[in-house]
Curated annotation (Swiss-Prot):
Its main location: cytoplasm. Coiled coil: none annotated. ATP binds at S10, F11, H18, G89, L90, R91, E99, Y124, A125, F126, L127, S128, S129, S130. Its EC number is 2.7.7.3. It is an enzyme of class 2 (transferase). This is Phosphopantetheine adenylyltransferase. Belongs to the bacterial CoaD family. It is found in: Cytoplasm. The record marks H18 as: Transition state stabilizer. Substrate binds at S10, K42, L74, R88.
Length: 164
C-alpha cells in the first residue's frame, strides 16, 4: 500500500518553513497532497488560486507533491485522496496544544488516518506567514524567509495595495 499524506494549511503565503516540511514529507511519503484551505476566520492576502500557483511553482521539482484546494473537513479530503496520513509542521511547543486538539478531533472522525508531526528546521522556528506579511508590508527584507517567486508576489501585492 502506498503511503499518502495530506499536508494542509492556508499558505498565505508559503514560506521556507512550509517548504521545509513539504520537502521532508516528500522524502518520507510516496505521495504528498498539499491541501490549500480557505480559512474563513482569516482574511487572506492571496486568493486560493494565487496560493496554489505559488505552491506549484516552489514544489515543481518534487514529482510526488501535488497542490490542490480543499474545503470542508480535512479527513474527508484525506479519504478522497486515499491518504493514510496527515502531515503537520510544528514550530514550537506552543503549536502543539492546538494541533493536539485538531488531531484528536480528526481521530474521532476517522481513526484510520494518522497524524504525523514534523518539527520544522530550527532556523524557521520563528517563521509564520503573518510575520512575513508584516515585514513585507513595510518593505523589509524577506529574502531569507520565502522563495524568490513569493517575495516578488508579495512586493506586487503590497505595491498595488499602496496604490489603492
Amino acid at each position: 500500500m502506498a503511503s499518502i499524506a495530506v499536508c494542509p494549511g492556508s499558505f498565505d503565503p508559503v514560506t521556507y518553513g512550509h517548504l521545509d516540511i513539504i520537502k521532508r514529507g516528500a522524502k518520507v511519503f510516496d505521495q504528498v497532497y498539499v491541501a490549500v484551505l480557505n480559512n474563513s476566520s482569516k482574511k487572506p492576502l492571496f486568493t486560493v488560486e494565487e496560493r496554489i500557483e505559488l505552491l506549484r511553482e516552489v514544489t515543481r521539482t518534487l514529482p510526488n507533491v501535488h497542490v490542490e484546494a480543499f474545503h470542508g473537513l480535512l479527513v474527508d479530503y484525506a479519504r478522497s485522496k486515499k491518504a493514510n496520513a496527515i502531515l503537520r509542521g510544528l514550530r514550537a511547543v506552543s503549536d502543539f496544544e492546538y494541533e493536539m486538539q485538531i488531531t484528536s478531533m480528526n481521530r474521532v472522525l476517522d481513526e484510520n488516518i494518522e497524524t504525523f508531526f514534523m518539527m520544522t528546521n530550527s532556523q524557521y522556528a520563528f517563521l509564520s506567514s503573518s510575520i512575513v506579511k508584516e515585514v513585507a508590508k513595510y518593505n523589509g527584507d524577506i529574502s531569507e524567509l520565502v522563495p524568490p517567486v513569493v517575495e516578488q508576489a508579495l512586493k506586487r501585492k503590497f505595491a498595488s495595495t499602496a496604490a489603492d
